[in-house]
Amino acid sequence: MRLVFTILGCGSSGGVPRVGSGWGACDPTNPKNRRRRCSLLVERSDGRGRTRVLVDTSPDLREQLLDAEVDWLDGVLFTHEHADQTHGIDDLRGLVIHHRRRIDVYLDEPTARALRLRFAYCFTTP
């Protein structure tokens, strides 16, 4: 079995550079300092196939998934309900529509309540 962890974003809730306030203490000449908001891709592969689970759906998710060439997810784990961890959820629709298959979601009850209020359309059966 092989596990691969890909950091899709590691910036703060506003990303780096921040809109309106720039780079802070980060050196703008270093390309690694341009950071998207937090998301992590976990891939497990073995002789039976591959499983991909995304940790959090940052507002930068569309670009993150395109850059990582992700064409399917088996699941999404939400760590908590803050906007910088959840507001990319709509970008999952393209995967669901294309594959005509739901994506399993893992989250605690407070996060589930918040997401059902904000994004009810994501949790209905088409």
Q: Which residue stretches match the model-derived regions?
A:
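Binuclear metal-dependent hydrolase catalytic cores
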Residues: 1-126
